[in-house]
């Protein structure tokens, strides 16, 4: 199953036909520019560089920079991963003593420019990202159809804030399934799926199929390609300890948490799709949890419940763009909705056979407290136009954690 088939279960909010087309035919068709938090420029212990990369995975280029600078990749800070098949600009921090070495580094399709001294950049140290995206292979009527879709979505309050396909895997759409197995304590089945699932189109698939059939760890270590380093880490640790649980805990923390995050994202997408079918997204109901919004940026840690008493007040705040209705990123400490929205949340959990306690019973590094996430996206500064012999060009800003591909999905209707 590829991501298109996977996403067919999630409803579109727009009912108008999409424009079709293709993205990322060229890396230059998808440009991402990070807007950092101003606080990263406070201090003198780290050197801040602007990293421009083309067709590079974020972690891969970070490790290459670290290798050439003679430092650990853990000493390089960055606010978030960016698309690989794109041209992206983001800020990274390195120890101040490594500034000159980093300035001298030359890597193909990578540029590094010293900006300032500051502090270590952590994940989440950004306001959001600016995008310039071209959709190719569209008809001349694409502009008018885009205009109709955007008008419809503005009337409905925005674009649905689905987690994009990057969260689940583009071809091996199994991250969320692995996450569910981990929540259920099925570490052996989670390992079998992570190591053995093959879609038939990727290097290493034959080795994966062999493991699926035999579960022979020694053979897998011989056959798995070196670039499947996390799979090999899992295999090595299992061989050493005889425990798939310990094997998962040996993975780097960001990789270890990908699976639980993917399952949380899947549950959120299920909730959002059901809400599109059954309940309003831009009209708060009694029992809803809303998040505060300032300058178009949602503050997900600032929430309050809708009650009979404050219902009209909250509705006005939502209309003015000062608050947004939220959905659940399930976790052991997440603030639950009540009323009809709360019943829908409970139905999602019951349908999956999962309780919130399961998120707490995970091994400590994997345990997830959960939080709220706004149901709608309102791209800031959205402009678009048709370029003859090229396609549709879009420019907009999105807050952190929001996916440009989810905006494009409503316009293209390609998945």
From Swiss-Prot:
| Active-site residues, Swiss-Prot/TrEMBL | 83
EC class name: isomerase
Catalysed reaction(s) here are: uridine(13) in tRNA = pseudouridine(13) in tRNA
In short, the EC number is: 5.4.99.27
One GO term in the molecular function aspect is:
tRNA pseudouridine(13) synthase activity
Record keyword Isomerase present? yes
Q: Which SUPFAM superfamilies match?
A: Pseudouridine synthase
Q: Which domain of life is it from?
A: Archaea
**What are the residue boundaries of the TRUD domain, all occurrences included?**
158-378
PANTHER family the record matches:
PSEUDOURIDYLATE SYNTHASE PUS7L (PTHR13326:SF21), TRNA PSEUDOURIDINE SYNTHASE D (PTHR13326)
State its role: Could be responsible for synthesis of pseudouridine from uracil-13 in transfer RNAs.
Protein name (database record): Probable tRNA pseudouridine synthase D
Q: List the source organism.
A: Thermococcus gammatolerans (strain DSM 15229 / JCM 11827 / EJ3)
């Amino acid at each position: 199953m590829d991501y298109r088939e996977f996403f067919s279960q999630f409803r579109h909010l727009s009912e108008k036909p999409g424009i079709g087309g293709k993205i990322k035919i060229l890396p230059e068709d998808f440009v991402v520019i990070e807007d950092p938090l101003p606080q990263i420029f406070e201090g003198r212990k780290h050197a801040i560089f602007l990293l421009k990369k083309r067709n590079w995975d974020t972690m891969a280029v970070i490790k290459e920079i670290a290798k050439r600078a003679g430092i650990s990749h853990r000493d390089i800070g960055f606010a978030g991963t960016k698309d690989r098949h794109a041209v992206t600009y983001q800020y990274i921090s390195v120890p101040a003593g490594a500034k000159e070495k980093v300035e001298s580094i030359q890597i193909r399709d990578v540029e590094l420019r010293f900006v300032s001294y500051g502090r270590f950049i952590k994940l989440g140290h950004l306001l959001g990202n600016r995008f310039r995206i071209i959709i190719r292979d569209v008809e001349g009527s694409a502009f008018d159809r885009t205009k109709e879709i955007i008008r419809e979505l503005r009337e409905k309050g925005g674009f649905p804030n689905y987690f994009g396909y990057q969260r689940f895997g583009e071809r091996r759409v199994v991250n969320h399934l692995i996450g569910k197995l981990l929540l259920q304590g099925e570490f052996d089945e989670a390992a079998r799926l992570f190591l053995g699932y093959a879609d038939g189109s990727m290097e290493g698939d034959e080795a994966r199929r062999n493991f699926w059939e035999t579960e022979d760890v020694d053979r897998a270590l011989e056959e798995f390609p070196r670039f499947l380093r996390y799979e090999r880490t899992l295999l090595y640790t299992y061989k050493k300890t005889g425990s798939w649980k310990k094997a998962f805990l040996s993975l780097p923390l960001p990789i270890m948490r990908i699976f639980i995050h993917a399952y949380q994202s899947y549950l959120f997408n299920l909730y959002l799709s059901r809400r599109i079918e059954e309940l309003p997204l831009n009209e708060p109901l009694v029992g809803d949890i809303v998040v505060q919004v300032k300058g178009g940026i949602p503050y997900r840690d600032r929430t309050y419940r809708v009650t009979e008493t404050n219902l009209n007040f909250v509705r006005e705040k939502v209309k003015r763009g000062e608050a947004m209705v939220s959905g659940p990123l399930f976790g052991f400490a997440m603030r639950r909705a009540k009323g009809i929205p709360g019943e829908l949340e409970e139905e999602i959990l019951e349908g999956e056979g999962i309780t919130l306690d399961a998120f707490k019973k995970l091994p400590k590094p994997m345990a997830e407290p959960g939080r709220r996430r706004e149901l709608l996206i309102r791209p800031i500064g959205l402009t678009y136009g048709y370029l003859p012999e090229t396609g549709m060009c879009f420019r907009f800003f999105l807050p952190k954690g929001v996916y440009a591909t989810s905006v494009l999905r409503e316009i293209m209707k390609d998945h």
